[in-house]
Amino acid sequence: KGTPHIDYDRLDAIKKAIPVPIVLHGGSGLTDTDYIKLVEHGINKINFFTAMTLAGADAVKEFAAATRKFQGTDVVNTLYQAEKAVVKHHIGVFGTQSI
């Protein structure tokens, strides 16, 4: 999809102009530093899916190639653990706090 170009000045103006939380839908191609800066510039909620599912798919491929096991519970657990790791990482990057 190419390199993301983020207009932080525009984001600042939007945040200043409207009294509602701002949501980022998708983050393909963004780095941890990009996410941190987006939060600093007013993003309140971040939706991401692709990175999580790609990590899960890669983990399942690696598991199947290494073990030759294709039982559903093994595949689901491998997928779950990989996706959980991505979500946990992003929660830390986003600076998410419990409510």
Predicted features along the sequence, with ranges:
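Alpha-helix-loop-beta-strand connector modules within alpha/beta enzyme cores
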Residues: 3-24
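Short, electropositive alpha-helical surface patch
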Residues: 9-15, 39-47
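Active-site beta-loop-alpha junctions enriched in small/polar residues
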Residues: 25-29, 49-51
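Catalytic cores of alpha/beta
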Residues: 27-43
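Short active-site-adjacent structural elements
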Residues: 31-34, 54-59, 63
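Glycine-rich phosphate-binding active-site loops on the catalytic face of alpha/beta enzymes
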Residues: 41-59
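Extended, intrinsically disordered, low-complexity segments
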Residues: 62-99
